[in-house]
């Protein structure tokens, strides 16, 4: 069996990636989230596949087909709740994974980090298109508002929006293409996750100290497979509790009303995992400026390897950077709260201050803190 595992053309790839993979002996539970993201992706693909068997991407029947899935399809209600709440768990794991990489300096593996940013962007696009599919009020108006942002692009903006819509408004053609992309993009994510892992295994995992761990490594199996399995059990428990006890806690009540182009909801907002970016978008009074700020709030992550000034990789022994990291975390939670509030005083000014702080911490305060810490340890 050992010979087959190590020399069979297919099994040896699995063996090198998940069994005999040399892993630092001191990595903590924060390193579990990569495997949890893989589990979330598989869950979303499987539940989505079963939902796609009964869903009809047509403006006249999309909403009723969702109702049909929940009422008439065997276990359709639980499949739908697992899929919609699974997206929330997915983003919770994703943001935690990114936060851990920032804290421990893993972004210095630039290829792994850049493929991770690409994965984040594709995940966000997939989730946005999925939110449109039930064709409720918030689905329709969310699609209208977010796609309309592209009209801010000079010269080609209006044509680009009509091209995305497939007409002069969000309609059947839009829903059809969103369904097609929502179905195919997760498979693209699987391929990109493979590339992500390939780059990671080229360099090996980082560790909490941020030091090279070549002299102290252990095999991935059984030590970390058991650890990951425990994390997976907790994830499944959390997802089932959410889907069975309070399935609508993270959703919007407006989405239980069929889409009505003649009736605008009082407060159009995306799902909770996009609220921080939505708050940054709204904090800029100019439309083009807001769109640029929205995209930069994600793309700014790509600058992190270039902005690293500290001689230490990890923040574990850098108290000043730790304070800034947790300030950034609180700032993102504040932006998430602001995004869920109406556009009025005092939420406008709080959103603007939080947005300025977000960009300031990443672009200025963290690099300056790194230089100060370098000076202090001389």
Curated annotation (Swiss-Prot):
- List, separated by semicolons, the cofactors it needs: heme b
User: Listed GO molecular functions?
Assistant: metal ion binding; ubiquinol-cytochrome-c reductase activity
| GO BP, sorted A to Z | mitochondrial electron transport, ubiquinol to cytochrome c
Q: Give the membrane topology, semicolon-separated if more than one.
A: Multi-pass membrane protein
Main location per UniProt? mitochondrion
Q: Where does a ubiquinone bind?
A: 201
Transmembrane segments annotated in the record for this chain: 33-53, 77-98, 113-133, 178-198, 226-246, 288-308, 320-340, 347-367
Subcellular location(s): the record lists: Mitochondrion inner membrane
Give the keywords, sorted: Electron transport, Heme, Iron, Membrane, Metal-binding, Mitochondrion, Mitochondrion inner membrane, Respiratory chain, Transmembrane, Transmembrane helix, Transport, Ubiquinone
Q: Which residues bind heme b b562?
A: 83, 182
Any one GO CC term of this protein is:
mitochondrial inner membrane
Instruction: Specify one Pfam family.
Output: Cytochrome_B
Residues that, per the record, bind heme b b566: 97, 196
Q: How is the cofactor bound?
A: Binds 2 heme b groups non-covalently.
The family database entries (InterPro entries) matched by this protein are listed as:
Cyt_b/b6_C, Cyt_b/b6_C_sf, Cyt_b/b6_N, Cytb/b6-like_sf, Cytochrome_b, Cytochrome_b_C_euk/bac, Cytochrome_b_N_euk/bac, Di-haem_cyt_TM
Q: What does this protein do?
A: Component of the ubiquinol-cytochrome c reductase complex (complex III or cytochrome b-c1 complex) that is part of the mitochondrial respiratory chain. The b-c1 complex mediates electron transfer from ubiquinol to cytochrome c. Contributes to the generation of a proton gradient across the mitochondrial membrane that is then used for ATP synthesis.
Look up the further comments and give them.
Heme 1 (or BL or b562) is low-potential and absorbs at about 562 nm, and heme 2 (or BH or b566) is high-potential and absorbs at about 566 nm.
Its quaternary structure?
The cytochrome bc1 complex contains 11 subunits: 3 respiratory subunits (MT-CYB, CYC1 and UQCRFS1), 2 core proteins (UQCRC1 and UQCRC2) and 6 low-molecular weight proteins (UQCRH/QCR6, UQCRB/QCR7, UQCRQ/QCR8, UQCR10/QCR9, UQCR11/QCR10 and a cleavage product of UQCRFS1). This cytochrome bc1 complex then forms a dimer.
What protein family does this chain belong to?
Belongs to the cytochrome b family.
Q: What is this protein called?
A: Cytochrome b
